[in-house]
A protein has these predicted regions:
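Short acidic, Gly/Ser-rich segments with clustered Asp/Glu that frequently serve as metal-coordination loops
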Residues: 10-16
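Active-site-adjacent betaalpha module
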Residues: 1-3, 17, 46-51, 63-66, ...
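A structural signal for short, well-ordered beta-strand segments and their strand-loop junctions
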Residues: 56-58, 132
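A short alpha/beta connector and helix-capping loop motif
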Residues: 17-48, 53-54
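Short glycine-rich, polar/acidic loop-and-turn segments at beta strand-coil junctions
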Residues: 11, 33, 59-62
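N-terminal nucleotide-binding beta1-loop-alpha1 segment
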Residues: 3, 7-9
Length: 192
């Protein structure tokens, strides 16, 4: 009845930025990912596999090399602009969390892992009622996915120390917004 959904933990988000100033601005995010989020998600994946709980991965990827099939938010200039053709190395899940051959991986071109994918149908077909969400970015794809799941009558848990946003402030603020309205926010220790 429960599945673990890992959202957008892709190589592109851990790559160095083009200039030093941008790298410095993103360093707290990189540190949180390396020191907390990725190790915690890895631990949770091991735990869920032991308990025979499904791990499902969502990743941003477009089918066409040109990106023609991307959503408007990914085509517009700015922070969300993203061109990640499905076979691009930087668009793959990070090596530390590499899906097993039998794990489901959905590709999306929207913030929500439900919009524009068959994830909703997959969850229903598998008899899933509860979804544990982890990944990035808390204030974008994680939040959008949580809201979509709740709208589709799934029970949702977000694991705080298995998620990250561009800044800790954004991360904490978004968790305050979605907690108890759309989901229950817990830490990894509480979830196990």
């Amino acid at each position: 009845e429960t599945a673990h959904l890992i959202i957008d933990v892709q190589k592109t988000y851990l790559e160095s930025k083009e200039n030093q100033k941008e790298n410095e601005e993103w360093q707290p995010f990189f540190n949180r990912m390396k020191d907390i989020v990725i190790p915690n998600i890895k631990s949770l994946i091991s735990f869920t596999r032991e308990k025979k709980i499904e791990n499902i991965f969502a990743r941003i990827a477009c089918h066409k090399e040109s990106g023609l099939d991307r959503s408007l938010s990914q085509k517009k200039p700015g922070f969300n602009y993203l061109l990640l053709p499905k076979d691009t190395p930087s668009g793959q899940i990070v090596d530390e969390l590499k899906p097993d051959p039998d794990d489901i991986v959905v590709m999306k071109t929207t913030d929500s892992a439900l919009t524009g994918t068959n994830l909703r149908l997959i969850l229903r077909n598998m008899g899933i009622k509860n979804v544990v969400c982890t990944g990035i970015f808390t204030d974008q794809c994680v939040s959008s996915t949580v809201r979509s799941l709740v709208d589709e009558s799934f029970n949702v848990i977000v694991i705080e120390d298995c998620c990250a946003a561009a800044t800790d402030e954004l991360h904490k603020h978004e968790l305050e917004i979605i907690n108890m309205i759309y989901c229950h926010v817990v830490n990894l220790e509480e979830a196990k």
